[in-house]
Structure formats: structure tokens, C-alpha cells
Curated annotation (Swiss-Prot):
Residues 4-51 form the SpoVT-AbrB domain. PROSITE patterns: SPOVT_ABRB. Pfam families: MazE_antitoxin. The keyword DNA-binding applies. The keyword DNA-binding applies. This is Repressor-like protein SSo7c4. InterPro entries: Repressor-like_regulatory, SpoVT-AbrB_dom, SpoVT-AbrB_sf. It comes from Saccharolobus solfataricus (strain ATCC 35092 / DSM 1617 / JCM 11322 / P2). SUPFAM superfamilies: AbrB/MazE/MraZ-like. It comes from the Archaea.
């Protein structure tokens, strides 16, 4: 099931991952995420990485 929330971009171009999303995917402070922008569809995708294997 998809979880959607609307977030606002802050002054420093930061966004906060909403609590519902953090809880559902067990995202914690210090976790790594990969941000991808798909120009063809105007979609930004955030992927949670395994910090032990996906760091680089």
C-alpha cells in the first residue's frame, strides 16, 4: 500500500520525511537514502539504502 504525504521544502532546500512514512519503513536518524529525479514524469523517488552495503 502506498503512503503519501505532502511536505514543504525548507529555506535550505530540505524536506522532512513525514512520521507516517518514517514509521512504516522504520527510517531512523542517520539512515542513508538515495534521491532520484525522473525528468520524464517529474517524479522524485526516495529509496532507503542498507547503510552497510549501499554506502557508495
Amino acid at each position: 500500500m502506498a503512503v503519501e504525504e505532502i511536505v514543504k521544502v525548507s529555506r535550505n532546500y530540505q524536506v522532512t520525511i513525514p512520521a507516517k512514512v518514517r514509521q512504516k519503513f522504520q527510517i531512523k536518524e542517520g539512515d542513508l537514502v538515495k534521491v532520484t529525479f525522473d525528468e520524464s514524469g517529474g517524479v522524485v523517488k526516495i529509496q532507503l539504502l542498507d547503510s552497510k552495503t549501499d554506502a557508495h
